[in-house]
Curated annotation (Swiss-Prot):
Primary role: Probable GTP-binding protein involved in generating and maintaining the structure of the tubular endoplasmic reticulum network.
Primary location: endoplasmic reticulum
Positions in coiled-coil regions: 636-659, 703-727
Residue ranges, Cytoplasmic side: 1-825, 871-913
Biological source species: Plasmodium chabaudi chabaudi
Transmembrane parts of this sequence: 826-846, 850-870
Protein's recorded name: Protein SEY1 homolog
Gene3D superfamilies recorded: P-loop containing nucleotide triphosphate hydrolases (3.40.50.300)
Pfam families for this protein: RHD3_GTPase
Membrane topology: Multi-pass membrane protein
Molecular function via GO: GTP binding; GTPase activity
Subcellular location: Endoplasmic reticulum membrane
Domain GB1/RHD3-type G: 33-288
GO biological process: endoplasmic reticulum membrane fusion
Gene symbol of the encoding locus: SEY1
Length: 913
């Protein structure tokens, strides 16, 4: 039940009304802050309390109609207000309160007062249950009011009930109960309004002394005080005021004058400057609600606790309102951040979000307990930071994608010279050449192709030998750039922002650091994957180039297949080449392999926190880093949960030292980056190169590469064993000791047989040589004896035997014929005579060629056959062709006559009409 000027806050049944907050807001009271006061009135029923308030504060509380008889009028507790607009309009300057005027002194400033009209005690309507409600209402009034008016009649001062002695005792007991623990509690104004007082009866000073001595002090002495207030005086808790009011009917004019004087005293003398209970106006409704509920539940009413509870409630409410007001802006920015990088995030967040939110929050929340206000402010900022974290994550993810791509491109570009060069190593005769020597002196070298190739070779070896160092330094640069971008997202906030008397420059500032670990972990994962990928590619390039070098060095093995005469010479040569290659690889490329090869077991590197230990992982290019006794795997397994890992890392004190080299990250995160990061990887590699276990592992690896290439070469030879045998046979059969072609016309049959036998034995000796039937310690482990498949050998032998026999038959034929059937023995004059005698035939064949298409294929086939025989020197076929030519020439004349007869037949004459 409320209207524009008043509202009921506690009904007759003792239930609090929920619309108090709305009523205060509608009447412009919720924005007063602490600039208001509360006054409550207690007294017997029908003692004129509401009448007094209506006259004193211009309120409109219901009053008793005496014509209808005495009855209960005010039920429960009602609340109204007075803004003292008449005082403001009148511009009274009689007040002495310094706060009653504004800073310019032109117009008085009077805080509004909330007036609490309490149901009268000693009520017949409530009967025996009245004491409960009276105690509750008194307790409620004292918890709220700056001033409590005790309304009593002059003629009842000597009575117990009518003089409100029992009520006064209840008031003082309750006040002591409420505030005895609060040393700095505000004093409550206890104002006794003596109604129907006449100066003729007794001076006001006498009445004041009587009330103080016989009522206040006596009751105070009778009270059972707690130990903390045993020696306390009544003046420590109350300000006693006694006011005499004339009879409202008999001396109405005097009564109104007394009311006016009391009103003026309240406005300019009695009222506290601000609400003494330190409850802001916007929290007054909730404070009333909390106080009454605590009283009804018969709980111990602790005013500081209630104030703390109200402060918590209101600060939370204000915080939520602020969050609601800015959530729309943040959501729009979050959506925008999904599509692009948010520029000037720091300025936008500090000015449009943080500063605006803090100011909006402190306007109302700063009126409540400072500790709770600041605590809730931290919660507000934390809630804002949680929302802003999404934008920061999107910005950092955008940054990490760019940096990840840049890292990959730069590392790839750094090694592009090695990727494009597909050649082989030029083996240096200097065994002590420094594999990591810089190519600064290459400009002084010969500019020939070989020198340029050596320059590229030296550059690639230098790059490969420093791969981990280059990747480590590039990682440092990348992470440093990421951290620089992250610092652009940090927000500067002002500590102690509630201290309004401090300038912003004098207030301490601190940065809020957003969580960047998720984005940094993704970037680190990408760096490790790209590094391992490029590392693997470069390792494969290095191995392929070594294989090409081995293949180049094994070229002489093909030449030896024709000339070698014993197995020992052949395999000693292969062993020599193997040792040469192994020595070159070990001397010049060992550091390259330690940098590039994944899976090499090391001591100094794997046990450190450098990049090598993180890169030396599985083929999925995940990365592993250790922290204390825990191991975290960041491979691409779907079961891995980065959030869970992040949580575990957060629980660790030095979590970032696990992700990166601790010194590196310490340098990166320093505000003043004067210290330069120096990678220790090359020093660790130098120590590692003296590790005997590593040296043995590397040498075994080199031997495996060389043997693999050698096996491929030997497999090629095995598959071509027939041609190898034939070439060896021809090198002895067709040429004599001084490498001159043999003249078979001058060789006897016996000599031919001996030559054939020797050549055949020499040719088939290669099979025994290739089977490695001798012991070679270094190669036996990898290349056993008789390693060539028997089937391959037999097939090769069979094919070679056929060809050898053909070669021998040709030699025998030449030996028998003496070479007479060869076209080389036909006189040149024969060809001239053949051309002259066969000229007409050539012309006839030419004419037939243009008439009969079948002649062309036959002619072309003939030309091809003859040309092939001439080219290959097939004497047998050429002899057949010679015989055919002689037969054609012998019978050419008869053939020519026949053609002339056919050609000279007269044509049939045409008929003439």
């Amino acid at each position: 039940m409320a209207n524009a000027s008043k509202t009921q806050i506690i009904d007759y049944e003792g239930h609090i009304i929920d619309d108090l907050k709305e009523w205060m807001s509608d009447n412009g009271l919720s924005k007063l802050g602490f600039n208001y006061n509360v006054i409550a009135i207690l007294g017997s029923q029908s003692s004129g309390k509401s009448t007094l308030l209506n006259n004193l504060f211009k309120t409109s509380f219901e009053v008793m109609n005496t014509k209808l008889g005495h009855s209960q009028t005010t039920q429960g507790l009602w609340l109204s207000y007075d803004k003292f607009e008449d005082e403001l309009a009148g511009g009274s300057s009689e007040g002495t309160d310094a706060e009653s005027k504004n800073k310019s002194g032109d117009k008085p400033v009077v805080n509004p007062t909330l007036i609490l009209d309490v149901e009268g005690n000693d009520s017949k309507e409530r009967g025996e249950n009245r004491l409960t409600f009276e105690h509750r209402s008194a307790l409620f009034s004292l918890a709220l009011a700056d001033c409590v008016i005790v309304n009593l009649w002059y003629h009842s001062l000597g009575n117990f009930t009518a003089s409100n002695y029992g009520l006064l005792k209840t008031v003082m007991e309750v006040h002591l109960e409420l505030f005895h623990q609060n040393v700095n509690c505000p004093k409550t104004i206890l104002m006794f309004t003596v109604r129907d007082w006449f100066e003729e009866f007794a001076p006001l000073d006498v009445i004041r002394e009587k009330i103080i001595e016989e009522y206040v002090n006596k009751i105070w002495q009778e009270l059972k005080k707690p130990k903390s207030s045993k020696n306390a005086k009544v003046d420590d808790y109350f300000i006693i005021e006694v006011v005499g009011l004339s009879h409202g009917i008999i001396k109405k004019d005097e009564f109104l004058k007394d009311i006016k004087r009391l009103r003026h005293r309240w406005v300019y003398e009695l009222r506290p400057v601000n609400y003494s209970r330190n409850i802001p106006a916007d929290g007054f409704a909730q404070y009333c609600h909390n106080i009454w509920n605590t009283i009804v539940k018969q709980s111990q009413l602790d005013i500081p606790s209630q104030q703390e509870m109200l402060a918590t409630f209101r600060c939370q409410e204000i915080k939520n309102n602020v969050l609601n007001s800015i959530s729309g802006m943040i959501k729009e920015k979050i959506i925008d951040s999904k599509n692009r990088y948010i520029e000037n995030f720091k300025t936008w967040a500090e000015t449009d979000i943080i500063e605006k939110s803090v100011n909006e929050y402190l306007i109302d929340a700063s009126r409540y307990q400072r500790s709770i206000c600041l605590k809730t402010l931290e919660e507000l900022l934390e809630a804002i930071f949680i929302q802003l974290q999404t934008i920061v994550d999107n910005n950092l993810n955008y940054t990490q994608r760019i940096l990840s791509s840049k890292f990959s491109k730069e590392l790839n570009s750094m090694y592009s010279v090695c990727t494009t060069d597909k050649g082989y190593f030029l083996l240096s005769s200097d065994k002590n050449a420094d594999a990591t020597e810089q190519d600064d002196n290459l400009s002084n070298m010969d500019k020939s192709g070989e020198s340029a190739k050596k320059g590229n070779q030296s550059k690639c070896i230098n790059l490969w030998s420093n791969f981990l160092y280059n990747a480590d330094m590039l990682e440092y640069t990348t992470i440093s750039n990421f951290y620089d971008q992250y610092k652009k997202c940090t927000i500067e906030i002002v500590e102690g922002s509630m201290a309004s008397n401090e300038s912003k420059d004098s207030q301490e500032k601190k940065n809020h650091d957003f969580n960047y670990k998720n984005s940094l972990t993704i970037l680190a994962t990408s760096i490790y994957k790209d590094t391992n990928r490029i590392r693997s590619v470069q390792c494969n390039i290095l191995i392929e180039r070594i294989r090409a070098t081995i293949k180049e060095e094994l070229k002489n093995v093909d030449n030896m297949l024709v000339t070698v005469k014993c197995s020992k010479d052949y395999w000693d040569y292969i062993l020599k080449v193997t040792n040469k290659l192994e020595d070159y690889i070990y001397t010049n490329l060992s550091k390259c392999f330690v940098n590039l090869k994944i899976g090499i077991n090391t001591t100094h590197l794997n046990n450190g926190d450098n990049i090598y230990a993180r890169l030396n992982t599985n083929s999925d290019y995940g990365f592993v880093y250790s922290h204390n006794d825990h191991m975290y795997d960041f491979s691409d397994d779907e079961n891995n949960n980065f959030d869970e890992i992040d949580t575990e890392i957060d629980q660790s004190k030095n979590d970032m030292e696990s992700l990166f080299n601790s010194k590196k990250f310490e340098i990166i995160t320093k505000q003043n980056k004067k210290e330069k990061y120096v990678s220790s990887i090359n020093n660790d590699l130098t120590k590692e190169m003296n590790n005997k276990k590593l040296i043995l592992e590397l040498k075994n690896f080199y031997i495996e590469i060389i043997i693999d290439a050698l096996k491929i070469k030997l497999d090629e030879i095995s598959n071509d064993i027939a041609n190898v045998i034939i070439n060896r046979f021809e090198s002895v059969f067709n040429y004599d000791e001084i490498e001159q072609p043999r003249q078979w016309r001058n060789v006897s049959v016996v000599e031919l047989k001996n030559i054939f036998r020797v050549s055949k034995d020499y040719a088939f000796l290669i099979v025994e040589i290739l089977q490695k039937n001798i012991k070679i310690d270094k190669l036996d482990k990898h290349l056993p004896n008789n390693f060539i498949n028997t089937d391959i050998i037999e097939k090769g032998k069979s094919k070679a035997k056929k060809r050898i026999q053909e070669i021998c038959r040709d030699a025998q034929y030449i030996q028998e014929t003496g070479g007479q059937m060869s076209l080389k023995n036909v006189p040149f004059a024969f060809w001239v005579i053949l051309l002259i005698l066969g000229w007409n035939e050539i012309l006839m064949f030419t004419r037939l060629f243009f008439r009969l298409n079948i002649i062309l294929p036959m002619f072309m086939a003939f030309i091809i056959i003859v040309g092939s025989c001439l080219y290959t020197g097939n004497a047998q076929v050429l002899s057949y062709l010679n015989k055919i030519a002689f037969i054609v020439i012998k019978h050419s004349y008869n053939f020519y006559k026949h053609l002339q007869t056919v050609g000279n037949q007269p044509t049939k004459p045409e008929k003439v009409d």
